[in-house]
Amino acid sequence: MAKWLGAPLARGVSTATRAKDSDRQDACRILDDALRDGELSMEEHRERVSAATKAVTLGDLQRLVADLQVESAPAQMPALKSRAKRTELGLLAAAFVASVLLGVGIGWGVYGNTRSPLDFTSDPGAKPDGIAPVVLTPPRQLHSLGGLTGLLEQTRKRFGDTMGYRLVIYPEYASLDRVDPADDRRVLAYTYRGGWGDATSSAKSIADVSVVDLSKFDAKTAVGIMRGAPETLGLKQSDVKSMYLIVEPVKDPTTPAALSLSLYVSSDYGGGYLVFAGDGTIKHVSYPS
């Protein structure tokens, strides 16, 4: 997680440094926490989340969270390469290219059967190999029933289970917080974009949150609630700018394995959110203010 969350930027990193998707996701998480803690109103949360998803630089994100109480400072972002380092790498790259060209020339001189070492028309390796193309069709529309169940299946294939601290599902990508298998005191964050990538950040463990099975909810009911959420909140479907679903354990100590699902909907005319249980039971509705 980049160190722009209210703390000084890493050496070599400036407010003009381009933001990554993981930086934007981290900002949205802090804004979600600020909404739940009462630091932000629903309208402020909607405006800041909308700005965070469109942020271009770390400075843009830093301004959105600078006045919030961030509990823990994340790991520092790696410093940018110096001009001297870039120059050194450039020289190494040039030397590598030269050695490759030399190798091509030697190989052509020994084995070549064309007029030029750059003429590959007679390459004996350019023959049909009978390998058919593999077309990948990973889940993309994650707010549909097929997309949502497909995402959970992809999670099982990647990690062997669907255990974790929190799953945030956007229309076309998702993020997942899981326990670090090497140290159960730490949390690893993963991003899904057609497949679960490598861990993008490691943050301090949240001791008061349980690890639960994040798939233990009625997916069909959840999709129905998502599709009806704009009308439930008094918004037009065509006005919706963003919608995302958070799946996490309930804070009720009497039901530690139960899930709480929070659905946030934003538009240019206000936003609101719904909180419901894994079986679809509505717990809370926050209408646009």
From Swiss-Prot:
The keyword Glycoprotein is annotated on this UniProt entry? no
Recorded GO cellular component terms are:
peptidoglycan-based cell wall; plasma membrane
- Xref: InterPro entries: DUF1707_SHOCT-like
Q: Taking the first listed entry, what is the main subcellular location of this protein, grouped into a coarse class?
A: membrane
Q: Where in the cell is it found?
A: Cell membrane
Q: Which keywords does the record carry? A: Cell membrane, Membrane, Signal, Transmembrane, Transmembrane helix
Which superkingdom is the protein from?
A: Bacteria
Q: Does the keyword Transmembrane helix apply?
A: yes
- Signal sequence region: 1-19
Question: What is the protein's membrane topology class?
Answer: Multi-pass membrane protein
Name the PANTHER family on file: DUF1707 DOMAIN-CONTAINING PROTEIN, MEMBRANE PROTEIN-RELATED
This protein is called what?
Answer: Uncharacterized protein Rv0048c
Which species is listed as the source? Mycobacterium tuberculosis (strain ATCC 25618 / H37Rv)
